[in-house]
Amino acid sequence: MKLPLLLAIVTTFSVVASTGPFDPEEMLFTFTRCMEDNLEDGPNRLPMLAKWKEWINEPVDSPATQCFGKCVLVRTGLYDPVAQKFDASVIQEQFKAYPSLGEKSKVEAYANAVQQLPSTNNDCAAVFKAYDPVHKAHKDTSKNLFHGNKELTKGLYEKLGKDIRQKKQSYFEFCENKYYPAGSDKRQQLCKIRQYTVLDDALFKEHTDCVMKGIRYITKNNELDAEEVKRDFMQVNKDTKALEKVLNDCKSKEPSNAGEKSWHYYKCLVESSVKDDFKEAFDYREVRSQIYAFNLPKKQVYSKPAVQSQVMEIDGKQCPQ
């Protein structure tokens, strides 16, 4: 899919600003999440989606477009909603990490344009209108730099290979293949892991960190994003009140070792009073993580039997018999 203009930054649900630089998977997640959270229902949904995919931020007077734009800006760090200022530092970080994706003079011009933007009230319309002229003037530069150019991104996916979650690959499968590769003695452990057995060894903790960060339950800064967990519960029509209590309890016992936080929260949820709801939500997240655009053309209706069937199919693929 052609990623939409760099202009956007999303707003509803969790709005955890990521830490750059960003790889193609991270930007794909950002753009599709911002689309999902802001697309209108009804006859305008598909035409609007088609434009956003082409980096055309229209209709410009639509609250949906404006909030989509703000969402991307916030998630990438181009706009700080707390300071209510634009910040070009991520542009330089991105160029330093991916120098082949831009020309130095054009990147500097883009960064200067962003840095010169005035303080702006933290609302969708104001942020969108402030950034839109910069987007239009530097669209090609930002599109290339933030992995919106299909051809450039294709080359990066090929270069990174097994070191990045590939398109149409679930993040669970990516992590499983990374830490329990096919043909290795460790592969058999997936038969237990995929049935929610919590292991206590270093390898499993690394694997869990990979998954929990991949589905954004844990941020790059090793912080719990409770809103992301709650979002998945709502996707399977589960009440979040009991979940909130469980997460608060888990938080009170959070380890100081950053490397064990993902494992701690996973174990805490799997062994909690909401474990069945968590497993159901987690399974559905696995299915949806195969296609980040899962809910874009239209919001999908959750079907537990269908998800169970899909997960069993993945089990058969990942767990050697």
From Swiss-Prot:
Its main location: secreted. It comes from the Eukaryota. Saliva (at protein level). Female salivary gland (at protein level). Detected in the head and thorax of the female mosquitoes, where the salivary glands are located. Expressed in the distal-lateral and medial lobes of the female salivary gland but not in the carcass. No or low-level expression in the adult male mosquito tissues. Residues 1-17 form the signal peptide. Noradrenaline binds at E176, R194, H207, D283, E286. GO terms for molecular function: IgE binding; odorant binding; toxin activity. Disruption phenotype: Mosquitoes show longer probing times when fed on mouse or chicken but not when using an artificial membrane feeder or mice deficient in leukotrienes. Reduced blood-feeding success, defined as the percentage of engorged mosquitoes after a fixed amount of time, when fed on vertebrate hosts. Disulfide bonds join C34-C71, C67-C124, C175-C210, C191-C319, C250-C268. Induction: (Microbial infection) Up-regulated during dengue virus type 2 infection (at protein level). InterPro entries: PBP/GOBP, PBP_GOBP_sf. One of its GO terms (cellular component) is extracellular space. It holds the Pfam family PBP_GOBP. Keywords: Allergen, Antiviral protein, Disulfide bond, Hemostasis impairing toxin, Platelet aggregation inhibiting toxin, Secreted, Signal, Toxin, Vasoactive, Vasodilator. Leukotriene E4 binds at W55, G148, K167. It is found in: Secreted. One of its GO terms (biological process) is regulation of defense response to virus. (Microbial infection) Interacts with envelope protein of dengue virus type 2. Lipids and biogenic amines bind independently through different binding pockets, with lipids binding to the N-terminal pocket and biogenic amines to the C-terminal pocket. Belongs to the PBP/GOBP family. Modulates blood feeding of female mosquitoes on vertebrate species by binding and sequestering different mediators involved in the host response, such as biogenic amines and eicosanoids. Binds serotonin, histamine, leukotriene B4, leukotriene C4, leukotriene D4, leukotriene E4, adrenaline and noradrenaline. Does not bind tryptamine and U-46619, a stable analog of thromboxane A2. Exhibits vasodilating activity. Inhibits agonist-induced platelet aggregation but not blood clotting. Inhibits noradrenaline-induced smooth muscle contraction. This is Long form salivary protein D7L1. It comes from Aedes aegypti (Yellowfever mosquito).
